[in-house]
Amino acid sequence: MDSTGEFCWICHQPEGPLKRFCGCKGSCAVSHQDCLRGWLETSRRQTCALCGTPYSMKWKTKPLREWTWGEEEVLAAMEACLPLVLIPLAVLMIVMGTWLLVNHNGFLSPRMQVVLVVIVLLAMIVFSASASYVMVEGPGCLDTCTAKNSTVTVNSIDEAIATQQPTKTDLGLARETLSTRFRRGKCRSCCRLGCVRLCCV
């Protein structure tokens, strides 16, 4: 698709293979695959900003040893890990305190019993707060950590169509609806669901 007058809308360079990734026309119609990949990794968009066409792409998180840790990622990791450390400690304190109160009640002074009850109650509060924080804020912290540490594979429109094209070339069969194909039993033998997947066309 490298014709005269076309240039990448991201880097404005005409060199290299230019491909279409969305429904845009004119000067924003084509771009380099690497340029668009970098733009998507930075912007975290899933659709074209101009025409709204969803990109054919797949996100993959890098292995942990390849992660880059900026200040934002370190803070998010600390926010996510601190409650995960506090939860087992709180459970341990609750179990030990309850065990001491139940099994050794006769050996403990009244003041020590009050101290153990307070410790158990505080451990329950810490456990509840930490568990709530992990459930509410945990996904956001994980997203912050993985945002800069994931790569995207984006397909051009031609590549996306090629991977989803029907294997039969007969126009009559290609125009059939999925329900018609299901009723006629034209599904491939490899399909265990018995119908509506594109691989069974």
Swiss-Prot record:
Pathway: Protein modification; protein ubiquitination. GO terms for biological process: protein ubiquitination; symbiont-mediated suppression of host antigen processing and presentation of peptide antigen via MHC class I. Residues 1-81, 135-201 are cytoplasmic. Its EC number is 2.3.2.36. Keywords: Early protein, Host endoplasmic reticulum, Host membrane, Host-virus interaction, Inhibition of host adaptive immune response by virus, Inhibition of host MHC class I molecule presentation by virus, Membrane, Metal-binding, Transferase, Transmembrane, Transmembrane helix, Ubl conjugation pathway, Viral immunoevasion, Zinc, Zinc-finger. Gene3D superfamilies: Zinc/RING finger domain, C3HC4 (zinc finger). InterPro entries: Znf_RING-CH, Znf_RING/FYVE/PHD. It holds the Pfam family RINGv. It catalyses: [E2 ubiquitin-conjugating enzyme]-S-ubiquitinyl-L-cysteine + [acceptor protein]-L-cysteine = [E2 ubiquitin-conjugating enzyme]-L-cysteine + [acceptor protein]-S-ubiquitinyl-L-cysteine. It is found in: Host endoplasmic reticulum membrane. Zn(2+) 1 binds at C8, C11, H32, C35. Residues 52-79 are annotated as: DIRT. This is E3 ubiquitin-protein ligase MIR1. It comes from Murid herpesvirus 4 (MuHV-4).
